[in-house]
Swiss-Prot record:
Ranges that cross the membrane: 13-30, 45-67, 74-96, 116-138, 145-167, 187-204, 211-233, 243-262, 269-291, 306-328
Keywords: Cell membrane, Membrane, Transmembrane, Transmembrane helix, Transport
Taxonomic lineage: Bacteria, Bacillati, Bacillota, Bacilli, Bacillales
InterPro entries from the UniProt entry: Acyl_transf_3_dom (IPR002656)
Function in brief: Presumably involved in the export of the biofilm adhesin polysaccharide poly-beta-1,6-N-acetyl-D-glucosamine (PNAG, also referred to as PIA) across the cell membrane. Is essential for long-chain PIA synthesis.
PANTHER family, per the entry: O-ACETYLTRANSFERASE WECH
Example GO BP: enterobacterial common antigen biosynthetic process
Membrane topology value: Multi-pass membrane protein
Subcellular location: Cell membrane
Name of the protein in question: Probable poly-beta-1,6-N-acetyl-D-glucosamine export protein
Length: 355
C-alpha cells in the first residue's frame, strides 16, 4: 500500500466538514417550518451547494483503494468489516438505544429500522460496504477495468436512468420499495457512477492531478455550469434536499474535482488540525448527528448570523468528536469504534513563533 498523499488528507478533512455543514443547514431549515417562501428557496439552493459531501466520500473511498492497491486479498474485505462495519454496528447500537429512550419505543424496533434497514444517517456505510465487495470482485476479474471509459460511461447511464425512473415513475418506485428490503438510499445503482469515477481517478491519479494543476479554471467554470443546469432542471419541492438524485450527478462529480484541485495547493495550513479531522473523519461522521440536536439548542441563538452559527457549531462539533476520539484512542480495543486511522495519526512537531 502506498503512502497517503497530503492533498488527500486535506480532501478527506474538507469533505467531513462539508457533511457537517450540510447537516447544520438542514437543522436550520427543520427548526424554521414557518419561514417565508423566499427564505426557503434561498436555503434550498444554498443547501444543495454543499450536498456533494456523501457522493464525494464514495468517490474518495474507491479512489484510495484503486490508488493504493494493484491487487487485493480476502483480508481487504476482512479489514473493512472490522474497522468500518463493526463501528457502524456499535455506534448504531448506541444510537438505537438513545432513540428508544427519546421516542419511548422498543430498542429492537429502533435497531432494525435504523441499523439493519439503513433508515438513519449511517445508511452511507451500507453503501460503502456494498462497494467494497464490488471492488473486490472487480479486482479479481481485472484491475484495469477501473481504467475503462466505456465502463465509466455505462455506470453514468445506469445511475442516471435508475434515479430518473425511481424518482419520476410511480410504478417503478413502488416496485423497488416493495422488493428492495433496505432503505431506498442504500441501493447501489443510485451511486454506481461515483464508485467507478473514484476508481478511474485512482487509476489515473497523477494524470488527473496534472490536468487540475494546469486547467483548474476550466473545472471552476464547469462547476458553475453544472450548478446552473441543476437550477434549471430542479423541481419545486424546496424542503427536500438530497444527493440521491440525477439532477446533481454532474455537479457532485465536478465539485469533487474542484475540491481536489484546490487541496493540491495546501501544504501547511492548519496541518495538525486537518490531520486530526481527516484521521477521525469516519468517527466524526457517525458521532456528530447524535450530538447535533443538543448543540443546536445552544448554537441556534446565533442563527440570524449564519456565518457565526456555522463557525461556532463546527468548532464545538469537531472539538467534541475529536476530543472523545482522542480519549478512546488511548485504548486499542476502541479501534472497533473509531476505526484504525486515528491510531496512525502523528502530529507535526513545530515551535510557534509568538514574537
Amino acid at each position: 500500500m502506498k503512502k497517503n498523499k497530503l492533498e488527500l488528507v486535506y480532501l478527506r478533512a474538507f469533505i467531513c466538514v462539508i457533511i457537517i455543514v450540510t447537516h447544520l443547514l438542514t437543522q436550520i431549515t427543520l427548526e424554521n417550518e414557518q419561514m417565508s417562501d423566499s427564505s426557503l428557496i434561498l436555503q434550498y439552493y444554498i443547501r444543495n451547494i454543499f450536498i456533494f459531501g456523501t457522493p464525494s466520500f464514495i468517490i474518495l473511498s474507491q479512489l484510495l483503494t484503486t490508488l493504493n492497491y494493484e491487487s487485493v486479498t480476502i483480508n481487504y474485505l476482512f479489514s473493512r468489516f472490522k474497522y468500518i462495519f463493526i463501528p457502524y454496528l456499535l455506534i448504531g447500537l448506541f444510537y438505537s438505544y438513545s432513540e428508544s429512550l427519546i421516542t419511548a419505543s422498543s430498542f429492537k424496533k429502533q435497531f432494525i429500522e435504523n441499523v439493519v434497514l439503513g433508515q438513519w444517517y449511517g445508511y452511507f456505510i451500507i453503501i460503502i460496504m456494498q462497494f467494497f465487495v464490488l471492488s473486490y470482485i472487480i479486482y479479481k476479474i481485472n484491475f484495469r477495468l477501473f481504467n475503462s471509459k466505456i465502463l465509466l460511461l455505462l455506470a453514468f447511464i445506469v445511475q442516471q436512468s435508475y434515479l430518473h425512473y425511481f424518482l419520476n415513475n410511480d410504478t417503478f418506485h413502488q416496485f423497488m420499495t416493495h422488493y428492495y428490503p433496505l432503505s431506498e438510499n442504500t441501493m447501489i445503482l443510485g451511486w454506481i457512477f461515483y464508485f467507478f469515477l473514484g476508481g478511474y481517478i485512482g487509476y489515473n491519479y497523477e494524470k488527473i492531478l496534472s490536468f487540475l494543476e494546469k486547467y483548474l479554471i476550466i473545472v471552476i467554470m464547469l462547476t458553475l455550469g453544472a450548478y446552473v443546469l441543476f437550477i434549471a432542471v430542479s423541481g419545486s419541492d424546496y424542503w427536500n434536499v438530497t444527493s440521491f438524485t440525477y439532477t446533481l450527478t454532474l455537479y457532485n462529480s465536478v465539485m469533487f474535482f474542484l475540491l481536489l484541485g484546490v487541496c493540491m495547493h495546501f501544504k501547511t495550513m492548519l496541518l495538525n488540525t486537518i490531520k486530526a479531522i481527516s484521521a477521525f473523519s469516519f468517527f466524526i461522521y457517525l458521532l456528530h448527528p447524535i450530538i447535533l440536536d443538543s448543540l443546536f439548542a445552544y448554537t441556534n441563538i446565533f442563527e440570524d448570523n449564519t456565518i457565526v452559527f456555522l463557525a461556532i457549531s463546527l468548532l464545538m462539533i469537531l472539538g467534541i468528536c475529536i476530543g472523545v476520539g482522542m480519549m478512546l484512542r488511548e485504548f486499542y480495543i476502541f479501534r472497533f469504534v473509531i476505526g484504525k486511522q486515528p491510531y496512525k495519526l502523528q502530529f507535526d512537531q513545530y515551535q510557534p513563533n509568538w514574537n
